């Protein structure tokens, strides 16, 4: 497997009325293809800031994020769209992140519909099943 995401010495600081807040300090890791990563920690420890920085939603103070070998900081707005379509953050409050009234299949299909990548429902449903298989989610959960 090859490295899909490489985060090197990532830092994110915010200026506040009380001084500088070190939200993310020297975070480094590599994520291989076909793997997932969960970031766990106390409230306010920088998990969301880390995710937003990796996605390029906010600029890092220092360090670099390489996705498929390219530095995310050097991507133009149009180049960032395909990058963001390949990554997703699910924030810690599942009730605000995932609609409990939607099926698992619908939750997975929704971003594909919004992005317009699979307009044909048959192809979209096939892709949803592939994604479920990739993460080991049994078909019986598709409509749960």
Give, region by region, the residue ranges found by the protein language model.
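ABC transporter nucleotide-binding domains
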Residues: 1-144
């Amino acid at each position: 497997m090859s490295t899909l995401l490489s985060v090197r010495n990532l830092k994110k600081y915010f200026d506040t009325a009380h001084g500088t807040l070190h939200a993310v300090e020297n975070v480094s890791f590599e994520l291989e293809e076909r793997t997932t990563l969960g970031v766990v920690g106390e409230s306010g420890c920088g998990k969301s800031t880390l995710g937003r920085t990796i996605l390029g939603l906010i600029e890092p103070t220092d360090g670099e994020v390489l996705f498929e070998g390219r530095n995310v900081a050097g991507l133009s707005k149009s180049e960032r769209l395909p990058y963001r379509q390949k990554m997703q953050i699910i924030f810690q409050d599942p009730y605000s992140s995932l609609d409990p009234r939607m099926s698992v299949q619908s939750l997975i299909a929704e971003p594909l519909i919004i992005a317009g990548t699979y307009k044909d429902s048959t192809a979209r449903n096939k892709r949803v099943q592939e994604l479920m298989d990739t993460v080991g989610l049994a078909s019986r959960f598709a409509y749960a």
